[in-house]
């Protein structure tokens, strides 16, 4: 996960620090009650939802649970494709640690049974604060050489492939928010899709 000469203890301390920061952010988000800002966020997410004939998705490098929290508040089902987990509106809301399989058959596809009209396919390209491997290690990709780590985790590798596929669909619209263009594996996909268009 981290490049450089870090001891196993240092690596664990870094992971725990990252998890604590995300936990603190989650607590702050839950108590944030500015109606207009929350409403704006909900309305924006609805623009990315799918219905049976839609094709919207969000691909993110963020590892927090901000989107999941706001989807729940907006009665939007938030689905992690290929992961047997989704957050359903009108149900008690809790972001638990989610077990991520270390192997995914190329034929295995989790199809969420959505109960409502609005659902959001949410691809977390660098893992998530609430994702756990079978070993109970967190699945957070940080630091340099991210592609090597992504290729070690089938779910992230599949998400990378899905990102490339979405970018290359005809008439794709891409909205980039808060990305500093420091991840070469992402930049390469963007450049290839742009030159192929």
Kindly label every feature range from the protein language model.
Residues 1-10, 44, 48-142:
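Extended, H/D-rich, highly charged conserved domains that either
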Residues 1-31:
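N-terminal accessory alpha/beta regions
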Residues 9, 32, 58, 151-154:
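Short, surface-exposed alpha-helical recognition segments that flank or form part
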Residues 17-23, 135-144:
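Short, basic/glycine-rich phosphate-binding loops at helix/coil junctions
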Residues 28-35, 145-151:
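Surface-exposed cleft-lining segments at the edges of enzyme active sites
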Residues 38, 64, 180-182:
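Short beta->alpha connector loops
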Residues 150, 155-157, 161-197:
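SIR2/sirtuin-family catalytic core signature
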């Amino acid at each position: 996960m981290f490049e450089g000469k870090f001891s196993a203890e240092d690596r664990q301390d870094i992971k725990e620090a990252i998890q604590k920061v995300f936990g603190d952010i989650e607590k702050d988000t839950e108590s944030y009650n500015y109606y207009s800002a929350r409403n704006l966020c909900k309305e924006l997410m609805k623009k990315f939802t799918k219905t049976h004939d839609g094709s919207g998705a969000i691909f993110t490098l963020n590892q927090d649970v901000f989107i999941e929290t706001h989807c729940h508040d907006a009665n939007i089902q938030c689905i992690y494709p290929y992961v047997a987990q989704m957050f359903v509106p009108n149900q008690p809301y809790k972001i638990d640690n989610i077990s991520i399989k270390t192997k995914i058959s190329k034929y295995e596809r989790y199809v969420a049974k959505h109960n409502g009209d609005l659902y959001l396919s949410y691809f977390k390209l660098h893992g998530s604060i609430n994702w756990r491997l079978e070993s109970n290690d967190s699945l957070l990709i940080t630091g340099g050489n991210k592609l090597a780590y992504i290729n070690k985790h089938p779910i992230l590798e599949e998400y990378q492939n899905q990102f490339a596929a979405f970018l290359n669909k005809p008439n794709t619209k891409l909205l980039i928010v808060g990305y500093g263009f420091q991840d070469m594996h992402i930049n390469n996909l963007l450049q290839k899709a742009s030159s192929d268009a």
